[in-house]
Amino acid sequence: MKTTKYYDYTRKKPDRARIKNDWIKFVISNPVKTEIQSDGRIKKWAKIPEVNKYLMVILLGDGETVHNAFFDRSFKED
């Protein structure tokens, strides 16, 4: 899994350290919603059943480099 330096840095935060790489890969492959930001970055969401929360993964425009990943408390599935 390709990542940015920013992601590698934020991954050290306690709330982010518990996010499993398998969950990130799941979101990338099985999003319930996808949005493209004006800067070309791609946001994807999927529910992680183990924690009953929605994980948002932000990818660079290449569609494979992870820039950020966190549980999105405000996400509501359409």
What spans do the regions from the language model cover?
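Ribonuclease/tRNase effector modules and their secretory precursors
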Residues: 1-78
